[in-house]
């Protein structure tokens, strides 16, 4: 859907509308920074005007005092109930980056059934890095850490560390082994994105894992007119996420199925 690409670019621009930040190397800290955007977009990006829900969730479980993240969890539930993984397909800047890389003229790989089973890893990562490790560090040392942001999140390197290091030479020297590890992980993810469709979203992203739980229940998303459906499965054969059923947990509501449906039985909107 051509409209989807426009929406993706608009979201990326709106999330990072603090253009002076890219010139000055300063992180915006105004009142909008207390508002979470729905997609994955690093808080520390010099252009970011809102907060990342994953970062906000972890910050509540980090530091010397624990705070139950009522606001962030409530917001994620609202986003999930309304849109599910439609947010992944339409309003996530890091998803857009992966899709653009996939358009490069490289050999493409469809995941085998064995590899598709590993999509459950994003749920393991969500529990381990978003909850268990922050709490474990807190009870062991008296201070929690934002484990996913610190050890895994590639958006933090792409959108924050690299731009800030390019703008401010003074911060380059302190970058150490952890930066090198995350840079390597980013390179692996971006390289893999050229031949596997949205690998980070499928295997690693906690936000995708959380929204996927609401996919079948969300108000908006892919819907099928069963009176028009002829059961040809052309929709599934052309699904870039290799969904086993329309609207399942891996579906990002990109609309590729609707474009190839011979009877126009598939549409995107209120279910």
Residue spans for each PLM region:
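Non-ligating segments of multi-cofactor redox enzymes
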Residues: 1-242, 249-250, 255-271
């Amino acid at each position: 859907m051509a409209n989807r690409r426009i929406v993706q670019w608009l979201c990326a621009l709106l999330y990072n509308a603090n253009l002076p930040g890219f010139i000055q190397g300063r992180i915006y800290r105004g009142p909008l920074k207390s508002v979470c955007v729905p997609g994955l977009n690093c808080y520390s990006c010099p252009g970011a005007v809102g907060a990342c829900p994953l970062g906000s969730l972890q910050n509540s479980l980090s530091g010397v005092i624990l705070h139950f993240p009522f606001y962030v969890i409530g917001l994620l539930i609202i986003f999930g109930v309304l849109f599910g993984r439609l947010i992944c397909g339409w309003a996530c800047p890091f998803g857009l980056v992966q899709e653009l890389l996939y358009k490069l003229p490289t050999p493409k790989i469809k995941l085998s059934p064995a590899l598709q089973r590993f999509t459950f890893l994003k749920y393991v990562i969500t529990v381990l890095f978003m909850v268990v490790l922050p709490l474990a560090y807190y009870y062991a040392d008296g201070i929690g850490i934002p484990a996913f942001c610190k050890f895994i999140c590639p958006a933090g390197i792409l959108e924050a560390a690299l731009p800030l290091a390019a703008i401010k030479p003074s911060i380059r020297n302190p970058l150490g082994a952890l930066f090198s590890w995350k840079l390597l992980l980013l390179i692996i993810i971006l390289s893999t994105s050229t031949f596997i469709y949205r690998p980070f979203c499928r295997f690693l992203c906690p936000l995708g894992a959380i929204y996927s739980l609401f996919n079948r229940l969300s108000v908006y998303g892919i819907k099928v007119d069963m009176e028009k459906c002829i059961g040809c499965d052309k929709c599934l054969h052309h699904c870039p996420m290799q969904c086993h059923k329309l609207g399942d947990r891996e579906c990002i509501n990109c609309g590729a199925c609707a474009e190839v449906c011979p009877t126009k039985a598939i549409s995107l909107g209120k279910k």
